[in-house]
Amino acid sequence: MASRQTAIPEKLSRKQYKAAMKKEKRKKRRQKMARLRALEAPPEEDDDVSANEELAERLLEIERQRLHEEWLLREEKAQEEFRIKKKKEEAARKQKEEQERQIKAEWEEQQKKQREEEEQKLQEKREREEAVQKMLDQAENERIWQNPEPPKDLRLEKYRPSCPFYNKTGACRFGNRCSRKHDFPTSSPTLLVKSMFTTFGMEQCRRDDYDSDANLEYSEEETYQQFLDFYHDVLPEFKNVGKVIQFKVSCNLEPHLRGNVYVQYQSEEECQAALSLFNGRWYAGRQLQCEFCPVTRWKVAICGLFEMQKCPKGKHCNFLHVFRNPNNEFREANRDIYMSPPAWTGSSGKNSDRRERKDHHEEYYSKSRSYHSGSYHSSKRNRESERKSPHRWKKSHKQTTKSHERHSSRRGREEDSSPGPQSQSHRT
């Protein structure tokens, strides 16, 4: 009863309890039947059972031995693979160490070469500095020193003809790209200040081809008035250095001539002093660029057709279009009187004075000022009246021919009375 209580739990429902009791009864019945069969079985069956058990044990042993051998083979194979893997890893490690050692050796060698090169450069720099210092000391001690002569192979320069525009005006529109040679003077009595004079009209000249209304923003009178202000502001500064015998300001519209200022002094020493004084200074928000100019003859530099308003190239002309100086100042230099022989006397001097009084500068600017007034219409009416009266034109033509004959006869008598070489040089 106690075993039954231990086998069957107490806290069960009635249905579960009955099922458990039936299960226990069946179990006991099977056990009982098994004991009876064991008692009734013959001894041969026991021998067969034991033989079967031994056979099963041998088979199990054989199977266990086979499995053990297979395991040994697998283990040996795994050990062999492990050894091969270790060898490969060791070889890779040694190869990596060898590569690192080579890289380190190459890096150290490269660093060594760099140090040697730096030391060599420092040594060369010290040697150059010592040589320069030695040359400076020698120059200070001897007071006579010059640069070493260039190699003989480099002394000869390929011949190139001189640029005529640079020699005449001191500027070339091609600049450094010019195929001809620019003979830059080392000393000259003429100083050139590039693009010193600037106005709104001169700066906007490039827009005329695209903006037809740009010229309405300025006029020639305003530009000339600005030039007069510039003239009275700048010229006294140049005169403080030395005697100025020519002062010209270019009104060209080409970039290489636009606003250039030409100042000719009486001597080259004064021009050198002006160059050292004005070069690099600031004026009107711009830094001045001064240089020596080869122009000493103004008759070949200034465009004569521009003075008569007949220049065919207009704003593309490469000769100087200059403003007229107030009161015709420096008019003697316009005809290169300072470059001519000082022995002109007699009628030749009178003729030169007469020609100077009839300067084309006055004609040009008087025409430009009268262009906007009514004089243009009056001259047009006069020409129309002359065309209507041919007899009057014939009469005036006869009078002019007679006056020319009188002047030519008078000039011939004056030439006969004047010295020959001087008059010939004046005519040429």
From Swiss-Prot:
GO terms for molecular function: RNA binding; zinc ion binding. Highest expression levels are detected in the brain, and lower expression levels in other tissues like epididymis, testis, bone marrow or muscle. In testis, expressed in both Sertoli and spermatogenic cell. GO terms for biological process: mRNA splicing, via spliceosome. Keywords: Metal-binding, mRNA processing, mRNA splicing, Nucleus, Phosphoprotein, Repeat, Ribonucleoprotein, RNA-binding, Spliceosome, Zinc, Zinc-finger. SUPFAM superfamilies: RNA-binding domain, RBD. Residues 367-377 have a biased composition (Low complexity). One of its GO terms (cellular component) is U12-type spliceosomal complex. Residues 189-295 form the RRM domain. Residues 419-428 have a biased composition (Polar residues). This is U2 small nuclear ribonucleoprotein auxiliary factor 35 kDa subunit-related protein 2-like. It comes from Mus musculus.
